[in-house]
Amino acid sequence: MEYESRSGLVALLHRLGLEYRKPEVIPRHLDETKQRAFIKLYEKLMNALGADEAVLFVDAVHPTHGARAAGCWAAKNEHLAIEQTTGRQRLNIHGAIDLETGRTKMIEAEAIDAASTIKLLAGIEALYSTTALIHVFLDNARYHHAKIVRKWLSQPGRRIALHFVPSYCPHLNPIERLWALMHQHLTHNKTYPTCREFADAILNFLRDEVPRKWGEFCDSVTDNFRVVLPANFRILA
């Protein structure tokens, strides 16, 4: 059976109950027990959260100053292009977000390491100066477990408690969704003449626009956690 038109083939696929889908990228090593335990712990903490406590999610992101093409709608016979940049410098941003308010703390660093972790945590404490206890959820990167970070946290008067997301589970850290939102708004099909302009746009979005427009963005950056299991997918490759 041959179909001479794309529309005819698409119609056949729909009649066969098929849809055009983009596969999810899932980690190779997923522990169901650890995922369920984390979600249970998180829900318990949130249900008992005091009025003088806050919850933030921390992660690092490394946007690259370069053209990032993405699919979009256009006239049928129109050829689209975006200009390539002259370099591929990379930003190093260590950041945190409060899902309740949309408040963020973002630092630009030479490198993401134990020093940037301490700088970020200190900035969070300063931002939440009247909050008795600040719960910070973050991944298991080695620098988050560094000896100098633990030493800093043990100092008298510190108000931060760290909670680690299970390994290989970026879907359990909502700030990952913020990074996706950032790319959607700032890097897809956009180009910036200089790296400084690129950095300014990224940092302005994360520091100012996200909190200011949180009512618009909050449904895209949520703690609607789910357990991800390879058995629930047909693995293509």
What function would you assign to each model-found segment?
Residues 32, 138-140, 147, 163-187, ...:
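RNase H-like two-metal-ion nuclease catalytic core shared by retroviral integrases
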